[in-house]
Amino acid sequence: MQPLYDHYLQFIRSSLKNDTSFSGAIPEEEQASLAALAEEHRTVPFVLPGFRNTSFYPAMLQKTKNMMLNYYQIDAFTRHTVSLLEENGIPCILLKGISLAACYPVPEYRKLGDLDLYINEPKALEKAQVLLEAQGYKEEKELSDHHVTYRYTFQKTGRSFLLELHYRVVGMYQYEPANQTVDEVYSPLRLKPIRQTINGFTYSVLPPTEYVFYMIHHMLKHYLYSGFGIRLLCDFVLYLKRYEKEIDFSRIHQWCEEIGRAHV
């Protein structure tokens, strides 16, 4: 492994483990490349301590502050949207986002993008779409076989956010047995969401075993179409560590065997 990547991974590891013994001294000739690598993978907060007293520090500190601000903005958008749905009798399941960020030592350091919600009942999905559009959520046309995309703009701030409203947890596979297994696992009759409290608000989320199976498929889809970076791997590892005792690994292996992807 190149020294640059070795140093980068040391920063990631020490930050996620809260290892204060790691000195994090960065050779001057690596500073520009390491800063660019962290920016590319949206992991600037994890390497920030190593750039103290360098010319890169002010800009990287500002990016870290922006990322933390974005976390609370997404948190507010998530709460706003889920509250709207639940107050109108529409159950939904929070995927990824602040739910996964809660597994990090510092949740605000996990880069957040759009909001992903899963509604697995067709009638509830239809009701949600009518409600959202009536409340100012604008549908954005997108080719997708598993979600509908909406943009919502807060009038007071002018800040807009994207909502991906999922009717399937992941996109369709060409291999039909895989689609059948995924549909069965996350069907209304089989799936039993659990509750997770984040920043004082309680959401419905996937149970640990189903969550891990979902993350495997999510990573596989990224790998097949565009590849995935270290953030997805960090999500996976931190979630496993947090919920290890609650995950039925034998069941996950069984599901993978059913779809002919046990090698995943």
Please place each PLM-identified region on the residue numbering:
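Conserved NTP-donor binding/palm subdomain of two-metal-ion nucleotidyltransferases/polymerases, i.e.
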Residues: M1-G113, I119-H263
